[in-house]
Amino acid sequence: MYEFFSPTKIIFGEGCASETVPRIREMGATKVLIVTGKSSTASSQGFKDLCKGLDAAGIQWVHFAEVGADPETSTVDKGAEVYRANDCNAIIGFGGGSPIDCAKGIAASIGEGRPIRDFVGTGLAFTKPVPPLVAIPTTAGTGTEVTNAAVFTIVDERGHRSKKGTSSQFYFPRLAIVDPLLHMSMPPSLTAATGMDALTHAIEAFVSRFHTPVSDMYCLEAVRRIGRSLRAACGISAVSDASADTSMNGASGAGRGVKAGSSGSGGRALLEARSDMALAATLAGVGLSQAGLGMVHGFAHPVGAMAGLAHGLANAILLPFVMEALIPDAGERLSTIGEALTGEQGISPQEAVRAIARLGRDIGIPENLEAAEVPQRYFEDILADALSYRRRKASPRAFTDDELKSLLERMYSGKVEI
């Protein structure tokens, strides 16, 4: 027996962002809190069009633009205060995974009338309805626009940072607006990292112990689209093109060590690749909500929290190592993944892992954590966090603590051959 629950209405297609205002008006919204990141989102044409549309419809709005990468629980609480102080009655999350996760947390906090920290890492469940929430992703990676999950950073009294995932049916946005045109300005390095994030979601959910025929369908279609379009979305027409360094070095570690081609304008071909990636991320999000995730995320969360490596990039680096370790336990399903990713038949589990690693190398993903400049001093803390990862039970292999330590050692300085 299995269940399938995915209540988010999805509107997908070029230009569909124009549907946002009429749809949120149908929800009875009169004053909207728009949650975005601190970066260039607010200066984007898509954001300006959204605000103009709300103004024209007579819907008031308040902009909360204090969301950093992997939002801290204190940021969520601050957003909830802004919502209450301005008597808002709906929320729009506009941007990448962090602003949308923050919007989810704000909605849940408003519904419960309590700080989000009361629910993160405590086991306490949400029980009360939330305000109308619309998610508008501008990156193709997390799929959070359709998931029941959100990830927040907790900073304790010692300054120790840890990322904790939470899940609830109340996190599902009421509406997801997935417009590939909003993704066209993503630089190649961000496209690469977020694209591999989506691939990680699809693969981990597909090999999960809790996979179902329905989740499999979503995950495999996501893998197919990523396999045929991620290189092109990064501006790479051939493997040899992946030579120009377009790294974006910043505090978030979003592009640390990432190389990819120039995105250029690309015309129709680039838009089609972006559309494939946008849909793939959404499909993978549906899949992971049904089947869960595994030890790639078990390691990626502490790597991101402690070393400042962007979540998508951390997943991209760690994915082939974990899948290599799963060959004895999930070989048949990895072969199926390999066939979907490459479009070829008769792929062995080993060839599938090499195909995953090759895709990462082609778009400039570093081959290990050392190459991504993750300091060795974080090793023990990363391991301790991974050992306590609550989703270990979804892994098709019941890793021992010693196996996870050996795996992390390999992630630091090893290499998955391609």
Identify what each model region corresponds to.
Residues 1-90, 369-370, 398:
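ATP/NTP phosphate-donor binding region
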Residues 17-20, 43-46, 73-75, 98-103, ...:
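Short glycine/serine/threonine-rich phosphate/pyrophosphate-binding segments
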Residues 74-181:
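Glycine/threonine-rich beta-strand-loop-alpha-helix active-site module
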Residues 149-291, 402:
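Carboxylate- and glycine-rich phosphate/diphosphate-binding segment that chelates Mg2+/Mn2+
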Residues 199-203, 277-285, 299, 319, ...:
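Short alpha-helical scaffolding segments that buttress acidic/His motifs in well-ordered protein cores
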Residues 291-348:
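C-terminal catalytic subdomain
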Residues 334, 341-418:
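C-terminal charged capping/lid subdomain of soluble metabolic enzymes
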